[in-house]
Amino acid sequence: MSAKIKADEISAIIKERIENFDLSVDVEETGKVISVADGVANVYGLKNIMAGEMVEFEGGEKGMALNLEESSVGIVILGKTSGITEGSSVKRLKKLLRVPVGDALIGRVVNSLGEPIDAKGPIEATETRFVEEKAKGIMARKSVHEPLQTGIKAIDALVPIGRGQRELIIGDRQTGKTTVAIDTIINQKGQDVICIYVAIGQKQSTVAQVVKKLEEYGAMDYTIVVNAGASDTAALQYLAPYAGVTMGEYFRDNSRHALIIYDDLSKHAVAYREMSLILRRPPGREAYPGDVFYLHSRLLERASKLNDALGAGSLTALPIIETQAGDVSAYIPTNVISITDGQIFLESDLFNSGIRPAINVGLSVSRVGGAAQIKATKQVSGNLRLDLAQYRELQAFAQFASDLDESSRKQLERGQKMVEVLKQPPYSPLPVENQVVIIFAGSKGYLDDIAAASVTKFEAELYPYIEAKYPEIFEQIRTKKVLDKEIEELLHKALKDFKATFSVA
């Protein structure tokens, strides 16, 4: 028996086929390279491309559209330029640059695109984020109130940093800027802070040394290193800080705390200037393009302390700027000083005279960190800045006047001892309770009758003595975070007992 063919069934099938017929064609917009030089390709034919959009060249190299002109597009090449020649085809990828984020990156060294460069295998990241993100608004933020201890006495006592702050480290070359940053990373051990170190335009050997130092102190367990070396293209150096801050924002947005160090933003500005001049953008002051302020402001504004509703996470930024012969009034230094919440100024004169870290306490300031400083540190360092300022004034005066009155001489001597107290060898950050004890000893006159040369020995022997005989002092400061009358009395007793046993020899 032959099956009956129903006309309405056939028409229903035909209708369904017509409705489901997909006429869309996957159109790929392609262009041709007109010229290529210095890591920038001029491309003709990509009429609908967006600013910041990713493209792919014939050999698989990626690029990013930065200049949109009437007849051509200026594309910076994110990789090797050797395979790209005049006439090479370029296709739009219709997406913006994203980098991997998350815990999988911790302990790794990556490039500006988040690709591993440490020969430890691929990174199994489950999430990616846009490199360019808008900074959080006012309502999403909370004022800085938790301390971020650097472990450096001069900073934690006089220029305190809070979680979510932007504090600039500024100084000439070879004044210990990177050392301050590495000390801060080492001091975050056990503090549940993820650190991101962004190296921009540095020698590969220097970055390798930093990574080795971090591994030596076990700091790579909670650190990500983003490296765009001196041999990398200007485009990769330009992208490195944005890639780093994107990785840091992931932790901040997940109710965690992160610290990011940009080493350094002077080289970042130079890379951006190089890229802009090749793209034929009009130069301004010091040949930097007009939007160089925006380059750094949009980067540093992404560091913040989030409010409780958003999880109370934080991202603290420590940008580094290199000055020429101590000139802080140059274009880039003044820009970054005005964007940040304070600066730590390192001086080559202090460094050369043996005061290390070479922090100029008079020029260094923290505009918001005071609220984050623990009460015990506030109590002992309240007059320290003023005392040091008076000491410097007296020191300048004493060079010309031989006969000083008794009180001036005492003030000069105590100032000298306090300068010694604030000295610290590199890669040896101090817990906050130890800092409180030694600054207390100096400010209460326990070092007055000890020679300046013996202060370091006094300090080195004091901590183990208190740990052995009066462990409750450290414990109380650590937990209570305040010097009450009881601890003060105990501290006086401990210092008197220690002085009785201390010998200079």
From Swiss-Prot:
ATP binds at residues 171-178. It catalyses: ATP + H2O + 4 H(+)(in) = ADP + phosphate + 5 H(+)(out). InterPro entries: ATP_synth_asu-like_sf (IPR023366), ATP_synth_asu_C (IPR000793), ATP_synth_asu_C_sf (IPR038376), ATP_synth_F1_a_nt-bd_dom (IPR033732), ATP_synth_F1_asu (IPR005294), ATPase_a/bsu_AS (IPR020003), ATPase_F1/V1/A1_a/bsu_N (IPR004100), ATPase_F1/V1/A1_a/bsu_N_sf (IPR036121). GO terms for molecular function: ADP binding; ATP binding; proton-transporting ATP synthase activity, rotational mechanism. Belongs to the ATPase alpha/beta chains family. HAMAP family: ATP_synth_alpha_bact. It is a peripheral membrane protein. The gene is atpA. Its EC number is 7.1.2.2. CDD domains: ATP-synt_F1_alpha_C, ATP-synt_F1_alpha_N, F1-ATPase_alpha_CD. It is found in: Cell inner membrane. This is ATP synthase subunit alpha. The keyword Ion transport applies.
